[in-house]
Every structure is written in structure tokens, then in C-alpha cells.
Amino acid sequence: MTTDLIDVRITRLPHSEGLPLPAYATAGAAGFDFLAAVDAPMTIAPGERVLVPTGLCIALPPAYELQVRPRSGLALKHGITLPNSPGTIDEDYRGELRIIVMNAGTEPFTVERGTRIAQGVLAPVSRLRWTEVETLDETARGEGGFGSTGH
């Protein structure tokens, strides 16, 4: 993957000391992994939601967001997902990045210090301007939704 790198400033909170910064696992990866900055193992019961700290704070450049997404391996093997996926970190947020994690599996799952718990994808943001009109253009689909175009 050939692309220009975008600088994102990052600071560590004390509970993330000793953990590596988020990193891309391969040269072609779109997402980088966030690590759990927990001091003690955290067990997530089936159906439970928890907030997992990363110990990191960032400053995104203007017109970007950071999308937080589940890791496919955790989802497939353990049912670990992010209920608000993708989560959005706005460019003006400066607090600790904490990940809302849910165990949709059937067995408890334990998050250890350094567990790769989620992935982040940097994305450009376009802002819209609403234009209120009396009617909308007609389309072949019209008002069909929720399965109206097939299964």
C-alpha cells in the first residue's frame, strides 16, 4: 500500500507505559491495533459490556476522524465485538481513548494487559450543509427500504 503518512500527535497516560504504540500488523493493513492498558486481567461475561482503557490520548488533524472497529479474529473466535461499531473519535476529542467492548459469545473472555482489543482506521470527514426543499427527486426505488431490493 503506497500512501502519504498523516501525522497524528499522541500522548501516553501512566497506565500505558511499557506498551507499544498502535501499529499496523502488515504493510497492506488498513487498520492498526489498539492494546488494552489494563493493570489487572478483566473478565467479560457473556452479554456484558465494558470500557477497556488504551492509556492513549490523540490530536487528530482537521477534517479527519478515527474509526474504532472490532477485530475479526476476536469476533469469530470469541464473540468479542464493539456494540457501537464503528465508534467515532472526533478531531476535537482529547481524552483517553477507551473502547466499548461487548462479549456476544457464550463463554467469559479475559482481557489481559496488551491484548489487541480493537482496530483503528483513520478516515477523512466531509461535512454537509442541509438544503431544505419541498420535494425530492423521484427514483426507481422510491420509498422502498428494509429488504425492498432483495434478500
Curated annotation (Swiss-Prot):
E.C. code: 3.6.1.23
Q: Which GO terms describe its biological process?
A: dUMP biosynthetic process; dUTP catabolic process
Entries under InterPro entries matching the protein? dUTPase, dUTPase-like, dUTPase-like_sf, dUTPase_trimeric
One example of the protein's molecular function in GO is: magnesium ion binding
Q: Which UniProt keywords apply?
A: Hydrolase, Magnesium, Metal-binding, Nucleotide metabolism
Q: Which domain of life is it from?
A: Bacteria
What is a single Pfam family found in this protein's UniProt entry?
Answer: dUTPase
Pathway as given in its UniProt record = Pyrimidine metabolism; dUMP biosynthesis; dUMP from dCTP (dUTP route): step 2/2
Positions annotated to bind substrate: R71, S72, G73, N84, T88, I89, D90
Q: Quote the catalytic activity from the record.
A: dUTP + H2O = dUMP + diphosphate + H(+)
Q: Name the needed cofactors.
A: Mg(2+)
PANTHER family attached to this UniProt entry:
DEOXYURIDINE 5'-TRIPHOSPHATE NUCLEOTIDOHYDROLASE
The free-text function statement in the UniProt record for this protein reads: This enzyme is involved in nucleotide metabolism: it produces dUMP, the immediate precursor of thymidine nucleotides and it decreases the intracellular concentration of dUTP so that uracil cannot be incorporated into DNA.
Family in the record = Belongs to the dUTPase family.
Q: What is this protein called?
A: Deoxyuridine 5'-triphosphate nucleotidohydrolase
Top-down, what is the taxonomic lineage of the species of origin? Bacteria, Pseudomonadati, Pseudomonadota, Alphaproteobacteria, Acetobacterales
